[in-house]
A protein has these predicted regions:
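Active-site beta->alpha loop and helix N-cap motifs at the rims of alpha/beta catalytic domains
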Residues: 1-21, 158, 178, 182, ...
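Structured C-terminal cap/extension of enzyme domains
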Residues: 74-193
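Short, functionally important structural connectors and interaction interfaces within domains
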Residues: 14, 29, 149-152
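Catalytic alpha/beta core domains of metabolic enzymes, predominantly
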Residues: 2-9, 17-130
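Proteins with a high burden of low-complexity, intrinsically disordered sequence enriched in S/T/G/P/A and R
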Residues: 1, 49-50, 137, 187
Length: 193
């Protein structure tokens, strides 16, 4: 509330897994009492995520639910998530955007094809140790030539091994990701970039 009182900027509440997330009653109260809150970034497990979508959409001032569940993004969008905020978007935003559009158009075959491509990336980005996820995305950006190398790793994390970097390269190939973006997308807006 103190932050909202200091600005009229829109705000997003981050629901970071069950252990540290706001209980649903508290989340609803925040959304009702703080008009700046326009959305939540939701990293909750499926059952809780769906409850958030249904509850927050039913408020007198509906709140957008933005998924950060990259590993099961298609399911999240089908549940009714309004969009996404994902670290993986630094590498695969075009695939994520196309998946969102396919789900909105109820084009299940296309959505499944895109989710299959995304799967290759999430398997290498979000594997153990989980804390290295952003370092893996940085390495992907370097491998794709989108960012100058070497990828910067902040302590206490350590640089990824060459074996892991090779797995990331294989995943980018399997997902059809190139320097310019995902290969073979139909979206005119993305093709023009």
């Amino acid at each position: 509330k103190m932050i909202a009182d200091a600005t009229d900027l829109p705000m997003i509440v981050f629901q970071y897994s069950n252990e540290v997330a706001y209980p649903l009653d508290t989340l609803v109260q925040i959304c009702e009492d703080v008009p700046n809150v326009k959305a939540i970034k939701d990293w909750s497990p499926p059952q809780v995520h769906e409850r958030h979508i249904k509850t927050l959409h039913a408020l007198s001032r509906p709140i957008n639910v933005l998924s950060t569940n990259s590993a099961w993004l298609m399911s999240s969008l089908v549940m009714g998530a309004d969009g996404l905020l994902s670290g993986a978007g630094s590498v695969i935003a075009d695939l994520q955007s196309e998946l969102y559009q396919a789900v909105q158009a109820k084009d299940l075959p296309k959505a499944q094809e895109l989710a299959d491509r995304i799967y290759h990336t999430t398997q290498v980005f979000y594997c153990d140790p989980f804390g290295d996820m952003h370092n893996r995305m940085k390495e992907a950006l370097v491998l794709l030539g989108r960012q100058d190398g070497p990828a910067v790793v902040r302590p206490p994390l350590m640089k990824l091994t060459q074996v892991e970097i090779a797995r990331i390269a294989e995943a980018m190939t399997a997902a059809g990701i190139a320097k310019e973006g995902a290969i073979g997308l139909d979206s005119p807006a993305l093709a023009a970039e």
